Amino acid sequence: MQLFCETPGFDIRPNVATIGFFDGVHRGHRYLIEQVRAVAAGRGLASSVVTFPVHPREVMQADYHPKLLTTCDEKVSLLAKTGVDYCMMLDFTPEIARLSAREFMSILKERYQIQALVVGYDHRFGHNRSDGFEDYVRYGCELGM
């Protein structure tokens, strides 16, 4: 697994990704990553996980300090064991938090060569977590993902 923060220092191959904090890399996370790997293999693409070193809610709420199951290093080690090709460790900033889901998906496609996103049925993101699965599908169609 190749790990990078923000901008890859290598030519990243077109890939299928999932996105989340992945604390503990539990059974549900591993199932989702298996789906990413299967979709990627079916399309002849690499597989990737987009995650964050700090819980996004900590960035938005100064008084939020969750008790985590794993350190960032432990999370990376567990993700490497899933067989995923890339781990993209992005800093979650207030600027990212203000992006719409569509804007964020566009950045993922252009900067990180993500061709498709695989998300759980209840995953939400975008400014104020305003967008869900149906929105992913619509934006994905609009962006060619």
Which residue stretches match the model-derived regions?
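Nucleotidyltransferase catalytic core that binds NTPs
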Residues: 1-145
